[in-house]
Protein backbone atom coordinates (compact mmCIF):
# COMPACT_ATOMS: atom_id res chain seq x y z
CA UNK A 1 0.00 0.00 0.00
CA UNK A 2 1.45 3.32 -1.03
CA UNK A 3 1.11 6.59 0.83
CA UNK A 4 -0.93 8.05 -2.04
CA UNK A 5 -3.44 5.21 -1.90
CA UNK A 6 -3.75 5.55 1.87
CA UNK A 7 -4.28 9.30 1.57
CA UNK A 8 -6.88 8.69 -1.14
CA UNK A 9 -8.66 6.15 1.07
CA UNK A 10 -8.72 8.59 3.99
CA UNK A 11 -9.98 11.47 1.86
CA UNK A 12 -12.72 9.49 0.10
CA UNK A 13 -14.18 7.48 3.00
CA UNK A 14 -16.92 8.65 5.35
CA UNK A 15 -15.10 9.51 8.61
CA UNK A 16 -17.83 7.81 10.62
CA UNK A 17 -16.81 4.45 9.16
CA UNK A 18 -13.47 4.62 10.99
CA UNK A 19 -15.23 5.13 14.33
CA UNK A 20 -17.69 2.33 13.50
CA UNK A 21 -14.76 0.02 12.71
CA UNK A 22 -13.19 0.86 16.08
CA UNK A 23 -16.53 0.13 17.78
CA UNK A 24 -16.74 -3.29 16.13
CA UNK A 25 -13.17 -4.15 17.18
CA UNK A 26 -13.52 -2.97 20.80
CA UNK A 27 -15.12 -6.17 22.18
CA UNK A 28 -11.99 -8.05 21.08
CA UNK A 29 -9.56 -5.65 22.80
CA UNK A 30 -8.31 -7.45 25.87
CA UNK A 31 -5.67 -5.12 27.30
CA UNK A 32 -5.76 -1.46 28.27
CA UNK A 33 -3.40 -0.34 25.50
CA UNK A 34 -5.48 -1.83 22.68
CA UNK A 35 -8.66 -0.37 24.19
CA UNK A 36 -7.03 3.06 24.38
CA UNK A 37 -5.84 2.81 20.78
CA UNK A 38 -9.35 1.96 19.59
CA UNK A 39 -11.24 4.39 21.85
CA UNK A 40 -9.06 7.37 20.94
CA UNK A 41 -7.51 6.19 17.68
CA UNK A 42 -10.81 5.64 15.86
CA UNK A 43 -11.94 9.25 16.30
CA UNK A 44 -8.43 10.54 15.56
CA UNK A 45 -8.28 8.62 12.27
CA UNK A 46 -11.73 10.04 11.48
CA UNK A 47 -10.40 13.53 12.25
CA UNK A 48 -7.42 13.01 9.94
CA UNK A 49 -9.77 11.72 7.23
CA UNK A 50 -12.02 14.75 7.62
CA UNK A 51 -9.17 17.25 7.53
CA UNK A 52 -7.48 15.52 4.60
CA UNK A 53 -10.72 15.74 2.60
CA UNK A 54 -11.19 19.47 3.23
CA UNK A 55 -10.64 21.50 0.08
CA UNK A 56 -10.34 18.47 -2.20
CA UNK A 57 -12.76 17.59 -4.95
CA UNK A 58 -14.17 14.40 -3.49
CA UNK A 59 -15.80 11.73 -5.58
CA UNK A 60 -19.16 10.81 -4.11
CA UNK A 61 -18.92 7.41 -2.49
CA UNK A 62 -21.94 5.52 -3.82
CA UNK A 63 -23.20 1.95 -3.57
CA UNK A 64 -25.98 0.29 -5.55
CA UNK A 65 -28.37 -1.62 -3.26
CA UNK A 66 -31.73 -3.09 -4.32
CA UNK A 67 -31.87 -0.77 -7.31
CA UNK A 68 -31.18 2.32 -5.19
CA UNK A 69 -28.08 4.46 -5.29
CA UNK A 70 -26.90 5.05 -1.73
CA UNK A 71 -24.56 8.01 -1.30
CA UNK A 72 -22.36 7.03 1.63
CA UNK A 73 -20.12 10.10 1.58
CA UNK A 74 -21.11 13.56 0.43
CA UNK A 75 -19.02 16.19 2.22
CA UNK A 76 -19.80 19.89 2.12
CA UNK A 77 -18.92 22.87 4.28
CA UNK A 78 -21.88 22.47 6.65
CA UNK A 79 -21.27 18.76 7.20
CA UNK A 80 -17.60 19.57 7.79
CA UNK A 81 -18.47 21.83 10.75
CA UNK A 82 -20.93 19.39 12.33
CA UNK A 83 -18.70 16.41 11.59
CA UNK A 84 -15.76 18.15 13.22
CA UNK A 85 -17.83 18.81 16.35
CA UNK A 86 -19.04 15.18 16.52
CA UNK A 87 -15.55 13.77 15.97
CA UNK A 88 -13.98 15.98 18.64
CA UNK A 89 -16.76 15.00 21.06
CA UNK A 90 -16.27 11.30 20.31
CA UNK A 91 -12.52 11.61 20.91
CA UNK A 92 -13.21 13.27 24.27
CA UNK A 93 -15.70 10.52 25.14
CA UNK A 94 -13.03 7.97 24.25
CA UNK A 95 -10.50 9.60 26.57
CA UNK A 96 -13.05 10.04 29.37
CA UNK A 97 -14.22 6.43 29.27
CA UNK A 98 -10.77 4.86 29.47
CA UNK A 99 -11.23 4.45 33.23
CA UNK A 100 -14.03 1.92 32.70
CA UNK A 101 -13.36 -1.74 32.08
CA UNK A 102 -16.61 -2.59 30.29
CA UNK A 103 -16.16 -3.55 26.64
CA UNK A 104 -19.91 -3.39 25.95
CA UNK A 105 -20.26 0.20 27.18
CA UNK A 106 -17.15 1.26 25.27
CA UNK A 107 -18.33 -0.42 22.10
CA UNK A 108 -21.84 1.03 22.26
CA UNK A 109 -20.47 4.52 22.96
CA UNK A 110 -18.22 4.35 19.89
CA UNK A 111 -21.04 2.79 17.85
CA UNK A 112 -23.28 5.72 18.77
CA UNK A 113 -20.58 8.26 17.91
CA UNK A 114 -19.70 6.54 14.64
CA UNK A 115 -23.32 6.33 13.55
CA UNK A 116 -23.79 10.02 14.36
CA UNK A 117 -20.75 11.04 12.33
CA UNK A 118 -21.85 8.74 9.50
CA UNK A 119 -25.30 10.35 9.48
CA UNK A 120 -23.73 13.80 9.08
CA UNK A 121 -21.92 12.84 5.88
CA UNK A 122 -24.35 10.57 4.01
CA UNK A 123 -26.05 12.01 0.96
CA UNK A 124 -29.42 10.27 0.69
CA UNK A 125 -32.44 9.62 2.90
CA UNK A 126 -32.11 5.83 3.04
CA UNK A 127 -28.52 6.01 4.32
CA UNK A 128 -29.51 8.78 6.73
CA UNK A 129 -32.36 6.64 8.06
CA UNK A 130 -30.04 3.65 8.54
CA UNK A 131 -27.41 5.73 10.36
CA UNK A 132 -30.09 7.46 12.45
CA UNK A 133 -31.61 4.14 13.49
CA UNK A 134 -28.16 2.82 14.33
CA UNK A 135 -27.78 5.72 16.78
CA UNK A 136 -31.14 4.79 18.32
CA UNK A 137 -30.17 1.13 18.69
CA UNK A 138 -26.75 2.04 20.10
CA UNK A 139 -28.31 4.41 22.64
CA UNK A 140 -30.65 1.67 23.89
CA UNK A 141 -27.73 -0.69 24.38
CA UNK A 142 -25.73 2.11 25.99
CA UNK A 143 -28.49 2.52 28.58
CA UNK A 144 -28.77 -1.23 29.17
CA UNK A 145 -25.00 -1.89 29.14
CA UNK A 146 -24.36 -1.34 32.89
CA UNK A 147 -26.65 -4.35 33.54
CA UNK A 148 -27.90 -2.94 36.81
CA UNK A 149 -31.41 -2.39 38.16
CA UNK A 150 -31.23 1.33 37.36
CA UNK A 151 -30.57 0.70 33.67
CA UNK A 152 -33.56 -1.64 33.37
CA UNK A 153 -36.05 1.01 34.52
Q: What is the predicted role of each segment?
A:
Residues 2-107:
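Transmembrane helix-loop-helix hairpins at membrane boundaries of multipass inner-membrane proteins
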Residues 32, 107-111, 115-153:
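Alpha-helical multi-pass transmembrane bundles of energy-transducing inner-membrane proteins
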